[in-house]
């Protein structure tokens, strides 16, 4: 399956993919470090083989295995100048991840990405990114988000809930 990653500039699309690339036994190098100004200016592709998927998702899947050859992630640029590349990535995908900075919320290219995905009839999930910037958030590098959330105080979770539901309207 092909997974497109779309969203506004600087909302962390390439960083999320770099994190995925760094997991598992077949670690790959960081793409963001090689991007001019840290901004994606072309469509990039990352393959995540089934064995890495199974390794990454084991804590969430309870030992179940993916019956898939793996995933091909397409990283699309978020800058307003690259609408055509976002549209191309969104229309190629079987599913998409719409990345939104939880502190910034929906921005122009976020809304444009939603329109692209709707027009292409590409199903998508929303990934709230930069959650670690919420005041009081206790980061646990390498932890699954669901586990990290259980470790937060009620005040921090109230702030998370407020920001999360603001994004969803």
Where are these regions (language model features)?
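P-loop/Walker A NTP-binding module and the surrounding RecA-like catalytic core of P-loop NTPases
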Residues: 3-169
């Amino acid at each position: 399956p092909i997974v497109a990653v779309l969203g506004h500039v600087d909302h962390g699309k390439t960083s999320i993919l770099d994190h995925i690339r760094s997991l598992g036994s077949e670690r790959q190098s960081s793409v963001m470090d090689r991007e001019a100004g840290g901004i994606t200016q072309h469509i990039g592709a990352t393959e995540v083989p089934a064995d890495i998927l199974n390794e990454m998702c084991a804590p969430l899947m309870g030992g179940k295995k993916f019956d898939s050859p793996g995933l091909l992630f397409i990283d699309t640029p978020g800058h307003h100048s690259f609408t055509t590349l976002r549209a191309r990535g969104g229309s190629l995908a079987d599913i998409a991840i719409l990345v939104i900075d939880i502190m910034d919320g929906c921005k122009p290219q976020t809304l444009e990405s939603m329109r692209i995905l709707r027009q292409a009839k590409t199903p998508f999930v929303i990934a709230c990114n930069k959650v670690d910037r919420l005041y009081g958030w206790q980061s646990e590098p390498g932890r699954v988000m669901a586990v990290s959330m259980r470790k937060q105080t009620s005040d921090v979770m109230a702030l998370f809930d407020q920001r999360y539901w603001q994004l969803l309207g």
